[in-house]
Amino acid sequence: YWMPGLGGKALWENHARNTARVLNAINPHYIRSRPFHAWPGTPMHNAIQMNEYQMLSPDEQLRELKLTIRELDVTAHVCFDHAGNYWKNRHGALLFTHSYEGYKFPQEKQTVLDLIDEGLKAGNQKSTFMRL
C-alpha cells in the first residue's frame, strides 16, 4: 500500500519521490493507493487542527500521484480500488477504475498518467471523501 498525501503540503514532493524509489526497489506484484485521511482523535488530525500540518487538496494529491507514477519503474499492478480514490474526470465519473487488478505496469503507465492529467483538467478542488 502507498498513501498519497501523507507528506502534506510541506513534504509532498519528497514523499512522492521516496515512495517511487522504495516501490522500485521492492518491485511488488501489487501497489494499492490509499490516500491519506486524518481521522478525528488521531495525532495527525490534532496537528491539522493546530495548523502544524497542512493536508493536500485533491488536485495537489493528483500532482503528487503524477510525480510518483512518472518515477515508477516496476512490473506490477497499480490499483486505485479504495473509496478514498475519489478523484473525478471532467464528466463527473471516477477517474480511475476501482478494479482489484488495477493497471498493469509498465504497459499501462501512460494510461494512468493520462488519467491524472484528465483529473487535473477537471479541477478536483473539493474533497468528496466520505467518512465511514
Where are the predicted features?
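Canonical radical SAM enzyme core domain
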Residues: 4-18
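Conserved radical SAM core fold
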Residues: 2-7, 38-41
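Long hydrophobic alpha-helices with heptad-repeat/coiled-coil character
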Residues: 3, 11, 25-29
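Auxiliary Fe-S-binding modules of radical SAM enzymes
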Residues: 17, 21-132
